[in-house]
């Protein structure tokens, strides 16, 4: 569960806020059928058909959030969101967890100021199950005192987790400073003291008051028959009675005041922000503010220009909208040795010029062109499209996402300049800075997995499911994939894979060059790949950085060059988009002056990074898993970066960038013949230079046990990783029984063994999961969780006991059935977005797997036995050799 926020920089990045809201429909709405209805009880229903994959995403949106929390209890809405997963009359928490795990998709929720959303993504054949759950939860919730006592521990772990994030701490300070005395002074998270004082009757009252059909909007998106789906919704929801709604709290904004805020961060770079209060979502000025944000965030604008000038490492502008107000802010990142005050002066000067003289008109047109492309691209993800529709209608109060694009199309340059003059109010801006501070080197950690305290583990008994869910669990079958990719090889050795899709008028190109800097960089040249990557953003031999960005804006394209490269365009611009991508990828400018700026900045960043707790945690883990001479332990230093020349970068580029190690995947409204013609036209003349380099890491010996604690003064909670290395490759047949067993341990929601024992039954952690990682030559097994320092060893002991249990006894039939159902359902879910389709096809090529590998995997999972899983865990897992690495306070 989460509280959703909008923005860039220290908040989740949103590339063009308006695009994310207006991107469900193109200019011609009839290409995406939409069915709307309002039931007699007031429930608004929107069903959008999208046939990208046999998948459905549902979003139940209650028009209530933290704004309506009782005074002194800012996390009430968030707490009730958690308790919605603790059961309802007729549906226990155990049943809900089991069903959520079986379905395999996103089963989550988020709470915002004026909205609480419940999200579920399932195979299309299981849409009835998702709708049953949401109808049951709308009717009522258990909200028992015993459940709240347990859930309180988990939600307080979430609070601790966020408070361990310096970015969140700065965000909280910013909200308090800009919105003092209003509900906006706090976000939806809540506080530990308020949760300690919260009683279950308060939560039940909150649900009874606000969780009514006449205060909700249900959005269903995916491969469904809209009319048949609406009838299912009527049957399940129509009898839920409407209720009178309480009066809503008013937000009385006082005058804005300038302030300066600061926090320390464990990150290797600092962040300087300049934030201004602006109108909220429902203001008539909001569309112009969206366009202004896009203009100020453009890499052609002066704010980003601080980066190539060497004055900042990164720079952008963002909008964090709330219902009745919002925050617009510039955010720039800087190295540890740079002066944030000087950056603040630079940013103020740039924004002051905009307020006085306005924005470049060509950037307004470019912003609109990018919005049009992003609008069409939103149809390329079923879950994303559901989110876009839900936000547009429930949060922004629009009739459809298309309405926002229509508003943006009407915005003029004069409108943008007017809102810039009015709202870029630097005299009342809040300046905020995160200053990088190292917390020290790793130290040996005691405790390990022993200790005297013994924790009694409960049994992970599966519970009987309702009749409407039981059939879904028992259905284990291989559904034919909706994908039929075609693979071919160009004469120069480049592999081309084409997957036609027609859900949108777009084409996406994904590329990957097989590479390993750890083995391909020359001795003493560590960091050369890190210099090359940003250097590729400076255009091509024909078009310098600004000219290249302008060419992309002309067609509304999004492009990135590197060993992983891509371009996203409207179908009509496919040829031009590939031409620009190839020009950048094969003929990069690599200007010497940019090389100087990047090397100087990177050397400072690397120096700070190798002292940062996050980096020390990762390096400590690698050092514990692999021998001292392993290539993965090579690291860039300030000295190695400063010693690099442009010739070193060019030499690395020529050695690594070659067609016979490259795979390109094209997905979208394009035929295989057209794709081959255009890819061949622009990439066909590319030739390899010399012999293929070695791109594989060596097989590693088994690691020894150990425990390392990395101090991090900025955290109040520990991040914990338990790990061991594996001599397992992705193509090894044992990958599948290990993956199935990992699903039993930690693969889905909180009906897994680890989550039941570490979160649900004991409240020791907020979240826990297990991950099987396998590459071309080696693998690893991880268990990761976050908890208070006094719980680190207790939680680790549970994890080790569960690993032993997987080896000592066969998985129960119900557990195995649920894990199989989960993995089988994840197959169609992985095909529900164009990005996932493209990257998954590249991965299969990278690991020498057949393109229809998911079909093979499904048959393996169906036939697999509990004995197969037990044998694989006995063969590969070594609980006594687990390494424990913690980041945060001293673990106990």
Predicted regions and their residues:
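Bacterial N-terminal signal peptides that target proteins for export
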Residues: 2-15
